[in-house]
Amino acid sequence: MTVIDNHEAVGMEGAPRLSEASARDYFELLKPRVMSLVVFTAFAGLILAPGHINPFIGFTAILCIAIGAGASGALNMWYDADIDAVMSRTAKRPIPAGKILPQEALAFGLTLSAFSVIILGLAVHWLAAGLLAFTIFFYVAVYTMWLKRSTPQNIVIGGAAGAFPPMIGWACVTGGISVESIVLFLIIFLWTPAHFWALALFKMGEYGAVGVPMMPNVCGEATTKRQIVIYAVLTAISGICPTLLGFASLGYGALATALGLGFVGYSLGVLRMPEGDKRMVPAKKLFAFSIVYLFAIFSALLVDYAIARIWFGGVI
């Protein structure tokens, strides 16, 4: 199947005027599901960081990070409009569906990017703003425009963009980067390949049709399955590092170990999956559990922190 370059073509014939795009269409352009994970992990970084931040400033910080994440999503949809129109899971996005013009999405994304970075710098901290600006640049220019269509390691390197939010949240409070914030970064960074390669396995045909060189399409199912197990193990190890490094309790460590074993267990299910299995049930199960894993790990860190504050320092 040939992919048409829709950066100019998508939405041009019979395209709606700006006034015809609803607020919901623009909200969908922000990738709200992805944004929810970004906001949650950034919030975790902000809460777990030592020190105090004014609640209003903290809210402003999280809002700016959310807007920056949404801006990245809008710019990603602008650039990927051609392949989004072909893939079933993305064909209903606002640009390929003809609800928003590509140039509108570009202007929207650039405006929100600048707004989020400037406000975060002025209201909170310029290091945090710099990290947010770098994250937006890395996701849009490095991952979306370069890596995604050029190498099967796209998600490994590009996954760094999704791992920065807790580090940004941490920097909003402390004005710096620490070992703890790097560990939070690593948990997400190492989690990303197994999560997305599980998706790539059961969407292999669609990625192949649009020319995106995902690991299963370039290196085959067997290699992808082995790589998934390796990254699942690394993710499980990184998940217990907060306890090993002394900034989370043994209770958290026990829960993180159980979650990590579950993650590895699901990855082994993918490894045992027969070659050419069209149903890809183990891959779908791993993909679903990986989302649960990440939310559970960061939730456990927050609960562990709250218990420690109440036990040792009174009511938060």
From Swiss-Prot:
Keyword Cell membrane in the entry? The reply is yes
One Pfam entry name = UbiA
UniProt keyword list? Cell inner membrane, Cell membrane, Heme biosynthesis, Membrane, Transferase, Transmembrane, Transmembrane helix
Top-level EC class as recorded in UniProt? transferase
Give the metabolic or biological pathway: Porphyrin-containing compound metabolism; heme O biosynthesis; heme O from protoheme: step 1/1
EC number, as in UniProt: 2.5.1.141
Name where it mostly resides.
membrane
> Could you tell me the membrane topology recorded for this protein?
Multi-pass membrane protein
What is the annotated localization of this protein?
Answer: Cell inner membrane
Q: Which family does it belong to?
A: Belongs to the UbiA prenyltransferase family. Protoheme IX farnesyltransferase subfamily.
Name of the molecule in the record = Protoheme IX farnesyltransferase
* Organism encoding this protein: Sinorhizobium medicae (strain WSM419)
Name of the gene this protein is made from: ctaB
